[in-house]
Amino acid sequence: MSTLFWILLVVAALIGGIAIGFFIARKYMMNYLEQNPPINEDMIRTLMMQMGQKPSQKKVNQVMRAMNVQMKNEKKS
């Protein structure tokens, strides 16, 4: 009987640890994305206007493509 109790206790602790870890990781990622939002097209347009450039859709697409390529290269390294 005590062996079955210990097995159930270990399984319950494992499931509890996984659940708690999931919620901690979720909260961490939500805080991270709130503090460091991903860059989108509107942010690039605003940045170009602040620099005195006229943000055409072609330029915005070029910058987005260049940033995506750079992010992929950084992930591979």
UniProtKB/Swiss-Prot annotation:
Keywords: Cell membrane, Membrane, Transmembrane, Transmembrane helix. Its main location: membrane. One of its GO terms (cellular component) is plasma membrane. It is a single-pass membrane protein. InterPro entries: UPF0154 (IPR005359). It is found in: Cell membrane. HAMAP family: UPF0154. Belongs to the UPF0154 family. This is UPF0154 protein EAT1b_0403.
